[in-house]
């Protein structure tokens, strides 16, 4: 944390160009091993005029423009660079306070990954700049130092200049910087992942995590919705949330700002502030390269076919596409130019079509090597995409990869990924989608012979039926638009042609768009309730209400024991919990087919369900009966390796799309620092399990505790199996490095009970959290009255830990001060201590904290109810009620000395039995606002998590 005495660097608005160029050069050097041979001045890429104008607007008004209109290839990803520099200016007092977080939201998973990767690369460059202590600090280092001043962490780890986040799958993967709430941050998200969190119902999140994630993504945040015309409902929803936040109490920080970025605006609101590219005004020297892109050579070639029907896997489309690819390859090979990459792009409408095209190219030996054609679709497992990116890093840049001759893709490549194809083959799609696909060709305008072939029906009359995911009217309009473009003297699909003859907007998939109102938000904010049924967010998030748009995921594991109880035990252990990295994205239709699958003996293989952070065994219905369970968006099924076929070319597909030869899959390895040993899966049982033979699980647990070292922890199953010689042996055990263990519990309930060092006294912990809360509030610029309320709440947030049952669980000395956390315990020891304690299952210490403070009104000030709320919700529970009443919470004889049991019981009955707590929650939400209260709770939780992370 930057202390008040630390001098901040000097940064001026005029240095944005140098920052932009320096960051671009640093990224280029990090991604390319070969040195840049161009003259130094030619190497520098300065911002375009429109990018400078956006920064000027932010610096002048303290808010982002509502809309950015910029054609494909004009550098919309620079919103990240602008965000970082604007915050650096704000940090040194050279610009007004602006949102600390930027969330780039885009509707393709691969694009979200691309945005996240770029953010991580920028972070790497800035961290490297901080280590350069030679001479006068350059602009990168000064910006990094300015951004670093927003951090409040104080441990052995150096603070980052900014944080990154990434939510693109069906699992909550702890990839949001909720603990560093004051930091500048860049977050990449899909529309569903962002939108569900904006409405307090984060897909894949635990109930306790929901309010914290909502606060992070909707307060002190600018959400940039890329290609907003593809997500009109989400745009309406987030804009309405931003409006309603203006009715809430003013905390002194920016509320949600929403920016739509697109080449085809989705609204015609004349009151919106719009900035962007004017293709008629590109005379500035800095716009020379942009002019090359806008007027690049992209010849349009229409290829009509008789048997076009818009269906997946259409053989005529596949054959015509393969034929066009062959001609492009022959042309490129004849033209030489082997020193440059000339990758041919192919973008089609369906995964089945993409798979068929790749299979045809490989089968017909169109290319010398199968590896020369790569498949890229949105339903790839992140682990597989990582491997592809690591193997072909330059493929995902405008430089290109010479070893890849063809990329076959679906809509994944329509938006945002910085590929640069020499030529493109695509099939008829809505005009706005085609415009995006055309943008993947000759992006920099360097080529003079690039062509775009569009496979289309022989006649517009052939487009009569919908061809999901597209409507007939949109395809028909696109056909007419292409004919108009083709009628020009030199048919082109470059950005200038798109401006002169704009693509026809797709027809709305809904008659009316829904906007959330105040009562909706109050209801959604009841995040800890157990409703009969979760609200269907499609109404507020999706342009289409088709149920099949809902997504889930599939995971395969090769190390689960056949004993289902032992397998559940592994999956419920935090180290081995499902992760987004190993999840195959799949729609609910695919998941349902997996559930219905029977092997050759008519047996349904076992499946595990991961939903909202909880693991359960899927209960298949008996023959002739309906299952009592049903799938929901965000559900993830876990399968044993090979038990159910569901992939083709490594992509989750329907059963009718399966290949004739079964796909070979591999399970994703566990992170570094974790090693799992399962008896029945172990290749060398004599070596790995010999010392545990004949021991009960309890005896093994004690032995493993003694074997744990300062750098490694060992945990074991509480279940046993029968060894080959008939002796008892544990089902599994694991070795975990302490660094991995510390990371796995950060922010969890377990972190509230242990540190991996010395015990922590309760008074010390609460004072530290209160002080960190004060620092956070000051850093954020919170209004003083709310800073005081937060500090009071933090000072007493763990009072409930004084309960003697909790102290016994921590192993506290009755003659010494109360503990906040035990010391020198592994996670496994903490779990065992809790299970053996006198505390009932589900008991919440923060519920008792709120009660004890409510019984001592002298401890709280003006905002009494707000303080109580922040205390009671300090771990995400109690919104709007707690699961347990006064009798469950209190037990006579276990209260700390000085507390009157009867008086406290009476107060607890009033709060948790009669309903005063529910009323308190309702009133504070109405008085302060659901987003404001969630944000204040999140600040206190961040302070608590930071102090715990630092071992206090």
Regions found by a protein language model. Name each.
Residues 101-115, 119, 332-363, 374-375:
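Conserved strand-helix element at the start of the C-terminal RecA-like helicase core
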Residues 127-207:
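Inter-Walker segment of RecA-like/P-loop motor cores
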Residues 192-250:
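SF2 helicase catalytic motif II
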Residues 97-124, 128-142, 192-196, 231, ...:
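Conserved Walker A/P-loop ATP-binding site and its immediately adjacent core
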Residues 251-257, 261-333:
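Interdomain hinge/linker at the junction between the two RecA-like core domains of SF2 helicases
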């Amino acid at each position: 944390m930057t202390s008040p005495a630390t001098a901040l660097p000097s940064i001026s608005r005029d240095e944005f160009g140098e920052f932009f160029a320096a960051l671009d050069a640093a990224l280029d050097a990090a991604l390319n091993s070969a040195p840049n041979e161009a003259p130094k001045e030619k190497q520098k890429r300065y911002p375009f005029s429109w990018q400078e104008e956006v920064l000027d607007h932010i610096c002048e008004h303290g808010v982002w423009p509502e809309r950015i209109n910029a054609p494909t290839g004009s550098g919309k990803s620079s919103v990240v660079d602008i965000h970082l520099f604007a915050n650096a200016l704000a940090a040194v007092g050279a610009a007004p306070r602006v949102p600390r977080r930027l969330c780039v939201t885009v509707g393709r998973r691969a694009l979200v990954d691309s945005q996240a990767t770029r953010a991580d690369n920028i972070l790497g460059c800035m961290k490297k700049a901080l280590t350069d202590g030679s001479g006068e600090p350059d602009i990168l280092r000064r910006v990094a130092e300015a951004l670093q001043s927003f951090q409040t962490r104080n441990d052995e780890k150096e603070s980052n200049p900014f944080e990154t986040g990434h939510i693109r799958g069906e699992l909550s993967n702890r990839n949001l910087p909720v603990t560093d709430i004051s930091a500048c941050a860049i977050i990449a998200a899909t529309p569903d992942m962002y939108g569900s969190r904006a409405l307090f119902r984060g897909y894949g999140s635990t109930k306790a995590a929901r309010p914290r994630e909502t606060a992070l993504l909707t307060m002190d945040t600018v959400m940039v919705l890329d290609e907003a015309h593809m997500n009109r409902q989400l745009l309406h929803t987030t804009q309405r949330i931003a409006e309603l936040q203006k009715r809430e109490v003013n905390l002194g920080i920016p509320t949600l700002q929403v920016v739509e970025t697109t080449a085809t605006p989705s609204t015609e609101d004349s009151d919106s502030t719009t900035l962007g590219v004017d293709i008629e005004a590109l005379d500035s020297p800095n716009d020379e390269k942009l002019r090359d892109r806008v007027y690049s050579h992209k010849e349009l070639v229409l290829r009509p076919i008789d048997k076009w029907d818009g269906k997946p896997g259409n053989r005529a489309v596949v054959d015509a596409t393969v034929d066009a690819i062959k001609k492009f390859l022959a042309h490129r090979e004849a033209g030489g130019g082997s020193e440059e990459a000339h990758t041919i792009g192919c973008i089609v409408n369906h995964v089945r079509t993409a798979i068929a095209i790749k299979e045809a190219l490989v089968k017909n030996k169109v290319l010398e090597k199968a590896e020369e054609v790569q498949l890229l679709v949105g339903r790839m497992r992140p682990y597989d995409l990582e491997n592809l990116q690591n193997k072909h890093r330059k493929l995902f840049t405008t430089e290109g990869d010479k070893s890849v001759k063809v990329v076959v893709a679906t809509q994944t490549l329509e938006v945002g990924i910085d590929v640069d194809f020499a030529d493109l083959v695509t099939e008829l799609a809505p005009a706005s989608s085609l415009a995006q696909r055309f943008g993947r060709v000759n992006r920099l305008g360097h080529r003079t012979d690039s062509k775009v072939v569009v496979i289309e029906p022989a006649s517009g009359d052939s487009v009569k039926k919908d061809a999901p995911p597209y409507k007939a009217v949109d395809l028909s309009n696109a056909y007419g638009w292409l004919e108009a473009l083709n009628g020009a003297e030199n048919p082109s699909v470059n950005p200038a042609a798109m401006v002169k003859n704009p693509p026809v907007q797709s027809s709305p998939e809904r008659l009316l768009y829904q906007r959330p109102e105040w009562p909706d938000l109050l209801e959604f904010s009841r995040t800890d309730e157990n409703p009969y049924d979760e609200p269907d967010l499609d109404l507020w998030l999706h342009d289409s209400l088709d149920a099949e748009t809902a997504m889930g995921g599939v995971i395969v594991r090769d190390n689960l024991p056949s004993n289902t109880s032992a397998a559940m035990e592994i999956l419920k252990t935090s180290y081995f919990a499902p992760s987004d990295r190993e999840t195959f994205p799949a729609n609910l239709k695919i998941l349902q087919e997996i559930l219905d699958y029977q092997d050759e003996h008519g047996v349904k293989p076992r499946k595990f369900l991961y939903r909202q952070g909880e693991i359960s065994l899927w209960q298949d219905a008996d023959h002739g009966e309906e299952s009592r369970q049903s799938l929901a968006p965000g559900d993830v099924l876990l399968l044993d390796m090979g038990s159910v076929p569901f992939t083709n070319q490594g992509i989750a597909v329907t059963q009718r799309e399966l290949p004739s030869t079964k796909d070979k899959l591999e399970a994703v390895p566990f992170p570094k620092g974790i090693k799992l040993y399962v008896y029945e899966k172990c290749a060398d049982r004599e070596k790995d399990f010999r010392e545990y033979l004949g021991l009960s699980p309890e005896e093994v647990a004690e032995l493993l505790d003694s074997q744990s070292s300062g750098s490694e922890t060992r945990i074991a199953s509480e279940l046993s199996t029968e060894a080959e010689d008939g002796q008892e042996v544990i089902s599994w055990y694991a070795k975990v490095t302490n660094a991995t263990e510390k990371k796995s519990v950060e922010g969890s309930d377990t972190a509230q009970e242990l540190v991996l060092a010395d015990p922590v006294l309760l008074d010390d912990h609460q004072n530290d959290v209160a002080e960190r809360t004060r620092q956070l509030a000051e850093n954020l610029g919170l209004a003083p009255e709310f800073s005081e309320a937060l500090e009071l709440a933090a000072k007493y947030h763990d009072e409930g830990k004084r309960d003697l049952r909790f102290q016994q669980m921590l192993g506290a000395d009755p003659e010494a001060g109360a503990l906040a956390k035990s010391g020198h315990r592994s996670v496994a020891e903490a779990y065992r201590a809790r299970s053996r304690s006198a505390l009932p299952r589900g008991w919440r210490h923060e519920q008792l904290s709120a009660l004890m403070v409510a019984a001592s009104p002298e401890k709280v000030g003006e905002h009494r109810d707000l303080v109580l709320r922040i205390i009671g919700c300090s771990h995400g529970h109690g919104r709007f009620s707690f699961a347990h009443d006064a009798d469950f919470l209190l037990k006579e004889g276990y209260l700390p000395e000085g507390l009157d049991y009867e008086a406290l019981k009476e107060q607890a009955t009033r709060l948790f039995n009669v309903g005063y707590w529910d009323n308190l929650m309702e009133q504070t939400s109405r008085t302060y606002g659901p987003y404001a209260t969630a944000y204040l709770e999140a600040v206190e939780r961040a302070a608590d998590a930071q102090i715990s992370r630092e071992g206090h």
